[in-house]
Curated annotation (Swiss-Prot):
A Pfam family: RNA_pol_Rpb2_45
Keywords per UniProt: DNA-directed RNA polymerase, Nucleotidyltransferase, Transcription, Transferase
SUPFAM superfamilies, per database record: beta and beta-prime subunits of DNA dependent RNA-polymerase
NCBIfam families, alphabetized: PRK00405.1 (NF001616), rpoB (TIGR02013)
EC number: 2.7.7.6
Substrates-to-products reaction catalysed: RNA(n) + a ribonucleoside 5'-triphosphate = RNA(n+1) + diphosphate
Record-linked CDD domains: RNA_pol_B_RPB2
Segments forming a coiled coil: none
A GO term for molecular function: DNA binding
Key word Nucleotide-binding present: no
Name of encoding gene: rpoB
Biological process annotations from GO: DNA-templated transcription
Claim: Nucleotidyltransferase is one of the keywords in the record: yes
This protein's name: DNA-directed RNA polymerase subunit beta
Length: 1359
């Protein structure tokens, strides 16, 4: 087994018993693939599939004029390249997008010609607006900020059957309904009412009898009855009535007469219930006709019209109920042996629902039914024949107005039981009748209703599909405008671009990416929060559910979530269950349904074949769990295996198993799979744990978790935070900001530059103001392969996710300071900067045009102290590296103010000192309250045409210098490579002449080549023409590369020197970035990975902390009472295993210090790595690599305990024993203050602790004098408004209870909204006279005004 560059530096010991045969899929694939399918940018126009942009264009084009004289056809589209790259767009506040151009053909027909003849064809490329591009990590940059389009889980198009669970009617009767949901178009509902009539609704409007719809579709009453019912046949034979017997239909009926055969044998006596035995007897007797009394016909319903054969008169119409009178008329008019057909109905399983509905239906024929539907859809409009037909045909039969979609058709056909899964995306008459038949069948007790929360009935709409819908909506708006203008095409000699206005398209796209509910500000706190945000699935958003209306069932975990949606990770609060996360191995299929992988089982043997199944397909198979036992050959060892079948957990024999899970972690999401010992945690706490990991703030120095799950490396690499080598090669140069790699020849294609330069991200602000900083982990000369990690990012350590720090934990109470989840922490943790984090604040100063003139950025600010001015350069902008505090000036700016009338004193001063500065006011950018730190970056943006200041020019020069350095490095390596190849080519060849008087026919030696300058090597002439040609090619290639580099430099120079796009009226914008160092302090929120969270109560001196027998003080003291009731035992197991990890590291460190032999260290390592769990291949590492591995392990051997497949208690004890630690995981602790041992043994060990993004610095705040509410004159609330503390109703009660009358009066008046009183308080404090004169609170005046607004005049009596 081969290790990657970073893996071999620190191998994580895994306790996994089962290795997954399927590597982890790319975690951002859903987003990236969906958008790639939407754009199809890399696909040739002729080969593009009908999806995404292509499908949207195809749906709208061709557009024809109303007169059909002109037509606009779409040929293809082309995406340009973005002017700025991602980083430039973020800096400049632009959207990272590319221009979209469509090639369109205008065809004008000849009006005068007798048959359609083309008169003129014009073809042109038309600009269609900008389409945002996705970054490599699956996000979008919109107006300079990174955003994510969250995938939506919505109800799949198709047909659904359900009932009201007996809630509608007081009797509790189940009312069945069916709904046909299209992707686009009108919803069609069918429903039963309590009287068992069947109705339909279109778009939830007024209900109408379903037979109205059937008649509108062209069915007659007789056809409807024939389609929905089976018939009973009777023959009138003289005085006898013969019934054509089908014995099965009589089952369960009460015999109203003796059923007798022709020979007089009685099969069933009168008033007896007909049983299955009777039915069998009748079938065996082969009795086909029996004589029935006339009463048997009474109440039956006629299936067809009965016509008098002599007169042609209709004696009885179809669907009439036979009564005595009607029966007499029928007997009189019908001939001997004539047949009557009636509907076969009963109360049990063949109800007369459609027949009853037909009776209440008032429409008579097709037209009257269509008119009734028209009146329902368009009340008040006169129904003309054309309008009626157009509306009815447009509802469900027109592709423009109605689209069931490919998914909808597949789901529809599958539900109505058809073999064919494809077909028309509009409805047909057969579709509608099939749905009604199934609905009637449900009422008759046949079939089952659908579960709408089943993942086979919910599909994912990813970013590509959502963007396509918006683009299509924009194009539809364009279509209307184009249709209007096309009629003028010929007369005005217009070109295609004159018709198409790109505004509606680009505004639809801009609105979607900028302000849609599904376009969210990316959570960038740490790499995990980024990756989780992109894998999120929301049931909210346009076309989805709303928080208020979503019930318990939708939010609940469903059996089909298994392996598709994580049952653990979901927010707490109103969105619980509506926002979910994709499971680890899940992906979406072509239809948008979530699939999960399984290994196929053949003949009780597990194969290597992997099959992805959706929830629809899965239920029919028997699927075993991933922890099922099987031997080396894959044969199940147990006779009976725990498995899932039809969404139920069950036991099955091993020969019935068809599939087996791919991995134990299959059911959970990325965040949940990062929790070690997840299987020992209560689900509620695991939910909090997975959510809190996303809030972990990156620490100054990231530290890998000693106890992980083995997926840390995958998350770090897939999130894009850690830098990967694009191609293999040798590290040529490394510094803190860039890595230069000389690429292996084998990986360099012809014409490519054989050098990769990685400019690392240094101290960049994230969306959540945390710090994104990358640091190299390679050295010069390191040999790398493709995909190797070469630099760590925020919260990553040697290419592994490292969200927190490993702390030495003791579970014990300590003076009540860890009461109720409080956390006690050692001062050493703070002094060692273990949890110190850097937060970057961005502050912006804007210089605008005002009516009185332009605001000016300058250092010449009135009344500015020398100390403040010293921090500003001559342009008035703060220096990089300046330490600034609240209130300091960052950007000096003055605004012109209107000239006021001067007082005589001011005139005199003006005359003496000649001061003219008073006509401007200071509007400088100051550091806001609560922020102090170091200025780390300044960016200046200047409008085109405005002169740049000195600082701006300096920034551009520095940027160009960095770019030039990159190009120089590239050129250096390219030249070295070219000269190397030239040297190999020339050495030993026969020359025809050359520099330094090289003699003809002399052999070129190494010494000669070294004596000549390298660029003169290309002047050497050779006898061999072939070699000369190769030398010429190397020279041409080098010249070409130089030209390319010069062009790249010129392009960069042009970009930087051109003006910036700024909002209207803005002349200059200065952004200042301040790095704020946040050290750990009381009030900060900390958490483990098991939902064990708390707030720091006190930071205790090291010498007072409890310590172990060897003198090691613990870092953190947690309350043991926080464990049993929360049932998150995982944290205790983590602490035990963490202690073992640290103990083993300590032993390895001792071996290194005593300079033990590499083979001895190798033996000890193999004891750790090869005893149990996953076997590691230490043999493949040489001694040097073993020593480097041991050095990296000396701080602790990292363990991986994968979820549901982790370390057992015995394995933890074994590791503790190997580390020479007590197997109980407990030890004696001593009180740091007294030195006495505590009575009981204490659980001690290492836990990975996170600092959460709920810092006390961001929350703590005190008001001095601040803003007041306009109406009530009370202080505002909240830190953002510099507000006060609310003194509410209950607090007033408290003071009343204490009888603190004066305090209460103070609170309700001068400290709140007594405007005059609070001014007087200030005066009395200044005078030193501490007297309070309380007046009328403003809120009382507001109350008086409110009462007056109700029409009651209220006044206070004046005394």
């Amino acid at each position: 087994m081969s290790y990657s560059f970073a893996e071999k530096k620190r191998i994580r010991k895994s306790f996994a018993k089962r290795t997954s045969i399927l590597p982890f899929p790319f975690l951002l694939a859903t987003q990236i693939e969906s958008y790639a399918d939407f754009l199809q940018a890399d696909v040739a126009p002729g080969k593009r599939k009908n999806q995404g942009l292509q499908a949207a264009f195809n749906a709208v084009f061709p557009i024809e004029s109303h007169s059909n004289n002109a037509r606009l056809d779409f040929i293809s589209y082309m995406l340009g390249t973005s002017v700025f790259d991602v980083k430039e767009c973020q800096q400049r506040g632009l959207t990272y997008a590319s221009p979209l151009r469509a090639r369109v053909r205008l065809t004008i027909m000849d009006k005068e010609a007798s048959k359609p003849t083309v008169k003129e064809v014009k073809e042109q490329e038309v600009y269609m607006g900008e389409i945002p591009l996705m970054t490599e990590t699956g996000s979008f940059v919109v107006n300079g900020t990174e955003r994510v389009i969250v995938s939506q889980l919505h109800r799949s198009p198709g047909v659904f059957f359900e009932h009201d669970r007996g809630k509608t009617h007081s009797s509790g009767k189940l009312l069945f309904s069916a709904r046909i949901i299209p992707y686009r178009g009108s919803w069609l509902d069918f429903e039963f009412d309590p009287k068992d009539y069947v109705y339909f609704r279109i778009d939830r409007r007024r209900k109408m009898p379903v037979t109205t719809l059937l008649k509108a579709m062209g069915y007659s009453s007789t056809q409807i009855l024939a389609d929905f019912f089976e018939f009973d046949h009777f023959t009138l034979a003289g005085n006898k009535i013969l019934f054509h017997l089908i014995p099965e239909r009589l089952r369960g009926e009460l015999a109203s007469f003796d059923i007798v055969s022709e020979d007089g044998k009685v099969f069933v006596q009168k008033d007896k219930r007909i049983t299955a035995k009777h039915v069998r007897d009748l079938q065996q007797a082969n009795l086909t006709k029996i004589s029935v009394p006339e009463e048997f016909l009474l109440g039956k319903i006629l299936a067809e019209d009965i016509v008098d054969k002599e007169t042609g008169e209709v004696v009885a119409t179809a669907n009439s109920e036979i009564n005595e009178t009607l029966l007499e008329r029928i007997k009189q008019t019908q001939n001997k042996n004539s047949e009557i057909s009636t509907l076969f109905v009963n109360d049990l399983n063949y109800g007369p629902y459609i027949s009853q509905t037909l009776r209440v239906d008032e429409s008579t024929d097709q037209m009257s039914a269509q008119v009734a539907i028209y009146r329902m859809m368009r009340p008040g409009e006169p129904p003309t024949e054309d309008a009626v037909l157009a509306l009815f045909n447009g509802l469900f039969y027109s592709p423009e107005r109605y689209d069931l979609s490919v998914v909808g058709r597949m789901k529809f056909n599958r539900r109505v039981g058809r073999e064919e899964l494809t077909g028309s995306t509009t409805l047909s008459n057969e579709d509608i009748t099939d749905v009604i038949k199934i609905l009637v069948g449900l009422r008759n007790g046949r079939g089952e209703i659908d579960d709408i929360d089943h993942l086979g009935n919910r599909r994912v709409r990813s970013v590509g599909e959502l963007a396509e819908n918006q683009f299509r909506a924009g194009l539809a708006r364009v279509e209307k405008a184009v249709k209007e203008r096309l009629s003028q095409a010929e007369s005005e000699n217009l070109m295609p671009h004159d018709f198409i206005n790109a505004k509606p398209v680009s505004s639809a796209i801009r609105e979607f990416f900028g302000s849609s509910q599904l376009s969210q500000f990316m959570d960038q706190t740490n790499p995990l929060s980024e990756i989780t945000h992109k894998r999120r699935i929301s049931a909210l958003g346009p076309g989805g559910l709303t928080r208020e209306r979503a019930g318990f069932e939708v939010r609940d975990v469903h059996p089909t979530h298994y392996g598709r949606v994580c049952p653990i990770e979901t927010p707490e609060g109103p969105n619980i269950g509506l926002i979910n996360s994709l499971a680890l191995y899940a992906r979406t299929n072509e239809y948008g349904f979530i699939e999960t992988p399984y290994r196929m089982v053949k003949n009780s043997r597990v194969t290597e074949e992997v099959v992805y199944l959706s929830a629809i397909e899965e239920s029919q198979y028997v699927i075993a769990q991933a922890n099922a036992n099987f031997d080396q050959t894959g044969v199940f060892t147990d006779e009976v295996v725990s498995c899932r079948h039809k969404n139920e957990f069950t036991l099955a024999s091993r020969d019935q198993i068809e599939y087996v899970d791919i991995a134990p972690a299959q059911i959970v999401s990325v965040a949940a799979s990062l929790i070690p010992f997840l299987e020992h945690d209560d689900a509620n706490r695991a939910l909090m744990g997975s959510n809190m990991q996303r809030q972990a703030v990156p620490c100054l120095r990231a530290e890998k978790p000693l106890v992980g799950t083995g997926i840390e490396r995958v998350v770090a690499v897939h999130s894009g935070t850690a830098v990967k080598a694009l191609r293999g090669g040798v590290v040529d140069y490394v510094d803190a900001g860039r890595i230069v790699i000389r690429v292996h020849d084998a990986e360099t294609r012809a014409g490519e530059v054989g050098v990769d330069i990685y400019n690392l991200t240094k101290y960049i602000r994230s969306n959540q103001n945390t710090n994104i900083n990358q640091r190299p982990i390679v050295k010069i000369g390191d040999i790398l392969s493709r995909e190797d990690v070469i630099a760590d990012g925020a919260s990553t350590d040697l290419g592994e996710l490292a969200l927190g720090q490993n702390m030495l934990i003791a579970f014990m109470p300590w003076n009540g300071l860890n009461f109720e989840d409080s956390i006690l922490i050692s001062e050493r943790v703070v002094s060692d900067d273990r949890f110190t984090s850097i937060h970057i604040e961005e502050l912006t100063a804007v210089s605008r045009d005002t009516k009185l003139g332009t605001e000016e950025v300058t250092a010449d600010i009135p009344n500015l102290s020398e100390r403040q001015r010293a921090r500003l350069d001559e342009s008035g902008i703060v220096y990089i590296g300046a330490e600034v505090e609240a209130g300091d000036v960052l950007v000096g700016k003055v605004t012109p103010k209107s000239e006021t009338q001067l007082t005589p004193e001011e005139k005199l001063l003006r005359a003496i000192f000649g001061e003219k500065a008073s006509d401007v006011k200071d509007t400088s950018l100051h550091v806001p309250a609560g922020i102090s730190g170091t200025v780390i970056d300044v960016q200046i943006f200047t409008r085109e045409g405005v002169d740049r200041d000195k600082r701006s020019k300096q920034i551009i020069a520095d940027e160009l210098g960095r770019f030039k350095k990159d190009l120089a490095d590239q050129m250096r390596i390219v030249e070295a490579d070219a000269f190397q190849r030239a040297k190999r080519l020339l050495a030993g060849k026969v020359a025809a002449g050359g520099p330094k008087k090289l003699a003809k026919n002399s052999t070129i030696t190494q010494e000669y080549l070294e004596s000549v300058e390298k660029h003169h090597w290309f002047d050497i002439r050779l006898i061999d023409e072939n070699t000369s040609l190769q030398l010429e090619q190397i020279k041409d290639s080098l010249v070409q590369k130089r030209k390319l580099f010069d062009l790249a430099f010129e392009e960069k120079q042009r970009k930087l020197s051109q003006g910036d796009e700024l909002p209207p009226g803005v002349q200059k914008m200065v952004k200042v970035y301040i790095a704020v160092k946040r050290r750990l302090q009381s009030g900060d929120k900390m958490a483990g990975r098991h939902g064990n969270k708390g707030v720091i109560s006190k930071i205790v001196p090291v010498e007072d902390m409890p310590y172990m027998a060897d003198g090691t003080p613990v870092d953190v003291v947690l309350n043991p009472l926080g464990v049993p009731s929360r049932m998150n035992i995982g944290q205790v197991l983590e602490v035990h295993l963490g202690w073992a990890a640290k103990g083993l590291g300590k032993k390895i460190n001792e071996m290194l210090i005593s300079q033990r032999d590499a083979s001895e260290i190798r033996d000890f390592l193999s004891k750790i790595y090869s005893d149990n769990g996953k076997q590691e291949d230490l043999v493949s590492l040489d001694d040097k690599e073993i020593l480097e591995l041991a050095k990296n392990l000396s701080d602790g051997v990292p363990f991986a305990t994968p979820v549901f497949d982790g370390a057992h208690e015995s394995e933890i004890k074994h590791m503790l024993k190997l580390a020479d630690l007590p197997e109980s995981g407990q030890t004696t602790l001593y009180d740091g203050r007294t030195g006495e041992a505590f009575d009981r043994l204490v659980t001690v060990g290492y836990m990975h602790v996170l600092k959460l993004h709920h810092l006390v610095d961001d929350k703590m705040h005190a008001r001095s004098t601040g803003p007041y509410s306009l109406v009530t004159q009370q202080p505002l609330g909240g830190k953002a408004q510099f507000g006060g503390q609310r003194f509410g109703e209950m607090e007033v009660w408290a003071l009343e209870a204490y009888g603190a009358a004066y305090t209460l009066q103070e609170m309700l008046t001068v400290k709140s909204d007594d405007v005059n009183g609070r001014t007087k308080v200030y005066e009395s404090i200044v005078k030193g006279d501490h007297k309070i004169d309380a007046g009328m609170p403003e809120s009382f005046n507001v109350l008086v005004k409110e009462i007056r607004s109700l029409g009651l005049d209220i006044d206070l009596e004046q005394h």
